[in-house]
Amino acid sequence: MAMATQASLFTPPLSVPKSTTAPWKQSLVSFSTPKQLKSTVSVTRPIRAMAEEAPAATEEKPAPAGFTPPQLDPNTPSPIFGGSTGGLLRKAQVEEFYVITWESPKEQIFEMPTGGAAIMRQGPNLLKLARKEQCLALGTRLRSKYKINYQFYRVFPNGEVQYLHPKDGVYPEKVNPGREGVGQNFRSIGKNKSAIEVKFTGKQVYDI
């Protein structure tokens, strides 16, 4: 009995706290109908998708008077080469590949743009390449070292042949009186406008 009395001195009596919450009442504000916004009269304009005018097909400029683009002969023999030109890539089946032709006065060894060396035949030669840049590299080598003129073409998968270079029959390193200059500015680079002067104008310093 004494132990129970002693325990009761250190143990606080358990009492259920009284609920202080007020009874719930439905709020008229939370369920009130929302105020209707003032309707502004707006004119609905039908949206019409304006079809952009398709750019006109870029028509190739005709060759200058007196110049006839040479025709490609597919039966022209290829140089003697034991290696590989790297193939025509997959794009040749769906886009195009390039063919360079030249005529050599004798049989001689030359460097291939794809690596290695080959023997050009005496007379006409034809070489298929995957890139236009390879044709330009080989053509520059033919003219600088062997003094041989060249032509190259673009061949499409459907068999269509397009003559590319030299477009007007005169190589670009030569002066052609009838050729129009592209992007020419007859001034030194030091006389260009300052870059800050053309900022946000959509132009470049060499355009002004």
From Swiss-Prot:
**Compartments, as annotated in UniProt:** Plastid, Chloroplast thylakoid membrane
Q: Which Gene3D superfamilies match?
A: Photosystem I PsaD, reaction center subunit II
- Any Pfam family from its record, for instance, is PsaD
Asked whether the UniProt record includes Membrane among its keywords, one would answer yes
InterPro entries (UniProt xref): PsaD, PsaD_sf
Alphabetized, the UniProt keywords read: Chloroplast, Membrane, Photosynthesis, Photosystem I, Plastid, Thylakoid, Transit peptide
Q: What is its main location?
A: plastid
Q: Which SUPFAM superfamilies match?
A: Photosystem I subunit PsaD
Tell me the PANTHER family matching this sequence: PHOTOSYSTEM I REACTION CENTER SUBUNIT II, CHLOROPLASTIC, PHOTOSYSTEM I REACTION CENTER SUBUNIT II-1, CHLOROPLASTIC-RELATED
Q: What is this protein called?
A: Photosystem I reaction center subunit II, chloroplastic
Taxonomy of the source species: Eukaryota, Viridiplantae, Streptophyta, Embryophyta, Tracheophyta
Q: Gene symbol?
A: psaD
